[in-house]
């Protein structure tokens, strides 16, 4: 068994949280894409790990797709609890991306909390809309926003991995079912506004999967 109790870092210098509380890390992915839903994940890691593999957990952007998938499965196996939430393209267009991101985060928190309660949220970023999961008696679940938290807190890094792996699988499934999306190179760019994606929008217009209120999509 491997311990990472207290405030000491893991092998990668990441901070683990207090041993007397269950603290959840929360992160989102695809906030800036032109296509598909925004995804969030909430992860509570154990205070004692079954092995040293947790030391490989780090910001998902620094991992290959194959490694992210491997670590996402590991995280889901060892986590005290975890949840994934999303907000649809329709919700994004109706209430804007910030509010849709909050909905995705709240849904991820809900899914995790109903399986195992926890005491606090660590949110990647600078803003979070306070929230009370079903079953919590107090007014709001305690939370703290941490800029670039996926680079410093193990639980947030774990959430970033789970969210990004979920989003990758969603995009791959979407393209498999709707091969016309290959015109936009969605499997490669994951929905982000790369030059080839933008050129395809100019040439072919937008699909039902595009966010109608985003950038160039507003004019197509």
Regions found by a protein language model. Name each.
Residues 1-220:
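RNase H-like, Mg2+-dependent phosphodiesterase core
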